[in-house]
Amino acid sequence: GLSFDVLLKRIFRQDPDIIMIGEIRDAKTAELAVRAALTGHLVFSTLHTDNAVESVMRLEDLGVPPYLISAVLRGVISQRLIRRVCTECGGAGCEACAHTGGKGRIAVAEIFPIDDSFAEAVYTHASPRELYRQRKQKGLPSMYEDACAKMRQGIITPQEIARVLG
């Protein structure tokens, strides 16, 4: 039969340089993505996690051993979309924003490039707390910190941060 993993295997045979997998939902897809990355393909995909560090934990939950995660993972971007403050009325509500105070959305994100020290931490099965500590030590802002910076610029509201990031 024609399944997702069969289609992925067929794509791999075409020897593309870059492969985009819409979402890694199960162990089989995770295994195929890792195998593709190990053979020199640049693989992009999505995972349902709350932040960048949890993406590593999710791959482990899907059965990818830490030594393989550390070998193939090059970076993680985690994002959420938050409603922007309407630029016409400053959030008070007007016809341009249908009296909601917000118009459009903007991403709040955390970007986590994987360097040697982080790969080593993953390889040695470091705790999530240690991975968060490394992120902070490198000066990489969390998604919450990115949201707060956008709030200070007047782009989003504290209420939206609370609604989306909890």
Where are these regions (language model features)?
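Short, flexible helix-loop junctions that flank or precede catalytic/ligand sites
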Residues: 1-166
